[in-house]
């Protein structure tokens, strides 16, 4: 039995009873990485020397009263979150040699909570992708079946947790990039409310949509991690001055009287039968615990995919303009003048998907097309947000599948961008609305690949979605299932 089969609270008891040490936890992580990483490929960079030194430092503090909330816990960090002195590439060749000189706010908070960073996790390049096949270095595989994708863009973050390489990880979610890989890998992933967690030090893809969040084995551990990283940050003007609740205290298991909305659009056309049936079965479980549900409509959801790709690509085209070979990152050797430097560095450094989105965004923002595309997409975004607010006026949470299907095979959709993009049709509306949502395991498809249940909450009401997710988790045994890697 792996130490990572235990929860944070259980591991803390073992540490305080001197049954294990922080060094034991760190060595467990690196031993597992040594055993499976050649197949999974979840990590881009390991930080073994510093992690072992940190473990020894923390071992001397075991039992101290001022220990952090996540004392001694090994964590992996998605490679678009900057780490001082630890290479951060965004899985892009254009940043292959980039070593940041500061920590992201979430990394500072993890250090204050006494975690141990094991390494940086693989992802789709600049967080653009749904399968991890867009990594500029190598693709991560799904620990449940290496022939299948782990999802994206936080595929490495989800796969590392599912494979038992770390206890938990950080990902980022722009259109589903935490929840979709969590569903595909049979783990728990939360996209917090926009502004709940500081984005300072997150390499921006789409600044109005990006949000950092936790990926864990259990809902309780997820609440622990969000507790540690939440809160206003003076370095991020978009972080919200909203009180952070006690997420752990909210895990009561009580859903009696809970009002659940189930959008008909989330169970209709484009959603596979396996995903639909798993959600209906989950609703029966919650009904048996005293909750009620009704079908509702989010009528503008059908426009979400087009709206998202116009807005996110427009923001990406602006954000990625800074990668020009002048200030940091890889610089082309094929240069005769400044224009060559810009053109060749970006042509050689960016992958095909990143180039595709930069071109789409540049077009949408160009003179003569701005009103027809970008401005109109912003107006539709407002309609989508209003749909959620109308539903939440009468219901506590919205529930549906996280993804239309279980994970698909490696290479199956890589040559068809539109089919690939459609994997996010159920997660994208949440980002456009800025509300929080969690994915928890809720079953398996015919290929024995995991399915996820998406629970969506009101703005800054992570407490309620944690309570519902935890109640469902404890009433079922899906969270006890492990990849047989």
Swiss-Prot record:
InterPro entries: Amidase, Amidase_CS, Amidase_dom, AS_sf, GatA. It comes from the Bacteria. The keyword ATP-binding applies. The keyword Ribonucleoprotein does not apply. Pfam families: Amidase (PF01425). It catalyses: L-glutamyl-tRNA(Gln) + L-glutamine + ATP + H2O = L-glutaminyl-tRNA(Gln) + L-glutamate + ADP + phosphate + H(+). Its EC number is 6.3.5.7. One of its GO terms (molecular function) is glutaminyl-tRNA synthase (glutamine-hydrolyzing) activity. It is an enzyme of class 6 (ligase). One of its GO terms (cellular component) is glutamyl-tRNA(Gln) amidotransferase complex. One of its GO terms (biological process) is translation. The active site is at residues 78, 153, 177. Keywords: ATP-binding, Ligase, Nucleotide-binding, Protein biosynthesis. Belongs to the amidase family. GatA subfamily. Allows the formation of correctly charged Gln-tRNA(Gln) through the transamidation of misacylated Glu-tRNA(Gln) in organisms which lack glutaminyl-tRNA synthetase. The reaction takes place in the presence of glutamine and ATP through an activated gamma-phospho-Glu-tRNA(Gln). Heterotrimer of A, B and C subunits. This is Glutamyl-tRNA(Gln) amidotransferase subunit A. It comes from Bacillus mycoides (strain KBAB4) (Bacillus weihenstephanensis). The lineage of its organism: Bacteria, Bacillati, Bacillota, Bacilli, Bacillales. The gene is gatA.
